[in-house]
Amino acid sequence: ASDVYKRQNLAAVIDPGDEPELIQEALEKEGVEVRYLLLTHGHYDHTTAVPALHRVYPQADIYIHQADANGAGSTLFPLTGEVDDLKLYDEGDVIRLGDHEIQVLHTPGHSPGSVTLKVEDVLFTGDTLFAGSCGRTDLRGGSYEQIMQSLKRLGELKGDFHVCPGHEATSTLERERRSNPFLMEAMRS
């Protein structure tokens, strides 16, 4: 699964996990200039299409959090050795796309370098927050305590947001505050 955030004929592709040809076809149909490939974390199901897309869009900067940039050869982190010009982002960084700002929130737990990308009233949560659930923490580098802290942080954001997770259905933050058992538990702590 991947998301495309577009503004003023510019695009950021978020978590291009597979099917680079379909992503490219959609981007060409939209007639946008791809500026960024933004990764919420480094697992293969969010990064597999990156090398192919970067060959087509070499001008696009690839961003990932430092904690997931060095995959140490794990099959979960296939970018290691395939893409050598990764740019690193961290908590508080801002990526500009036209006149819009994409804010980086470090939300570890699913992986050490998991981030949520906040832009306008949208949260691209990767595998941190799902509709009705949260990402698994039993993979290498995962931490239940950290994901609960990250969920609490997201739940405490002021206002409502559209939630675009890395898998399954979209939601709203307000709906998740009322019905997601993991988010509700995190906010009680």
Question: Language model features by range: what are they?
Answer:
Residues 7-16, 30, 74-79, 101-106, 111-189:
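Metallo-beta-lactamase
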Residues 8, 32, 58-59, 119-122, ...:
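Short glycine/proline-enriched coil/turn segments at helix->beta-strand junctions
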Residues 12, 38, 62, 124, ...:
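Residue-level marker for buried hydrophobic side chains located in beta-strands
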Residues 13-14, 39-40, 83, 105-106, ...:
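Short, flexible loop segments at the rims of nucleotide/cofactor-binding pockets, characterized by
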Residues 18-100, 178-185:
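Active-site HxH/HxHxD metal-binding segment of metal-dependent hydrolases
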